[in-house]
Every structure is written in C-alpha cells, then in structure tokens.
Amino acid sequence: MKEIQFKRAELEDKEVISHYFKHHTSRSCERTFANVYLWSRQYPVKWAIVEDALVFKSEDESHLAFAYPAGEPENVKKALEVLMEYSKERGIPFQMYNVTPDNFDMLEEWYPGRFQIEYNRDLADYVYEAEKLATLSGKKLHGKRNHINKFKTMYEGRWSYESVTKENLEDLSLIHI
C-alpha cells in the first residue's frame, strides 16, 4: 500500500481543507478550518487527501481513529478502504469519529452490519443562541457567567482582548484548556 502523507494543518492548507468542507458540509465544529488549525496545535490530529477525499487522523501511542472523510460518496468509500487497510497493517482496530447518522447510513449500505455506532456525549458539540451566549442571559448560562467572573477576578490586570493577527497566531497554541 502506498504510504499516506499525513501532515499538521498549516495556514497555507486553508484553501484545500476549506474546499472539501464547503462542498461536503457538516454542522460539526470539527468541520471548520479554524478548529482544525487550532486544535492540531494541542492534539495529534493530521490530515491528508486520500482517494480525493479529505481525511483526518488522530493518533498517539495508544489510539488511532479517523474522522469520517469529506468527499464524494464514491471517493469516501475508496478512502475508507485505504484507511481500513492502514489500520490493519498496524494491527489496530479501525475506528472513526465525527460520524453523522447520514454517514452511518452510507456505511451500512456499503458494509452491512460491519460497524456499530456509539454516541459519546463528552465529545458532542454545544449549540447556543448567539444573543444569549453574547449576553450570558438566562438561568442555563448562569454557570458560564460564574466561570467568566471568576476568571476576571483571578486574572485581574493580566488578560486582554486582542485581534488575531499573523504575528500572534501561534500564541493561540499556547492556550491550554
């Protein structure tokens, strides 16, 4: 099997990655270039184009998983075949994340009964109304208000709002959440 050239997302990759996201939409926060770029500084996430499908790989010493590929269905299926072989060659069970119900339907059509889907609430996106999040109004956001107020008190005089520029972009990777 030809070796896949996975790499960390860099600013010059934005056009390619965004092209696939634009044409193969998802409501997941993981399908935005900003998210991919920033989190790849914190976590072992890399990307590659495999069979004309965009693939993300998360791998460390103890785990290997792939995001469901972004691409035309026939290319996604070809990419999945390559990724399953990639996992098999390493002796690691094939796993995917960021699989939507529609994606799972495609998997069932291509590979009946081969996969099981498990929902992991800890990895779910949170959706807020923009106005409520901006103002932190309402009972549901009380905890968020408290966290922000605690932060402001603890770090008084040591924090600021700044525009993100090329000069300070890499500093964002120093933020540990």
List each model region and its residues.
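Sequence-level motif detector for i,i+2 pairs with an aromatic at +2
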Residues: E12, Y43, E61, R121-A124, ...
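Generic N-terminal amphipathic/basic segments
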Residues: M1-L38
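A short beta-loop-alpha structural element at the N-terminal edge
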Residues: E3-V16, G138-K139, S160-L172
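Acyl-donor-binding surface of acyltransferase catalytic domains
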Residues: G71-E167
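Conserved donor-binding loop and adjoining core beta-sheet/short helix segment
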Residues: H19, C29-D102
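Conserved small/polar residues in nucleotide/adenosyl-binding loops
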Residues: I175-I177
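Residues in flexible loops and secondary-structure boundaries
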Residues: K14, C29, H63, A134-L136, ...
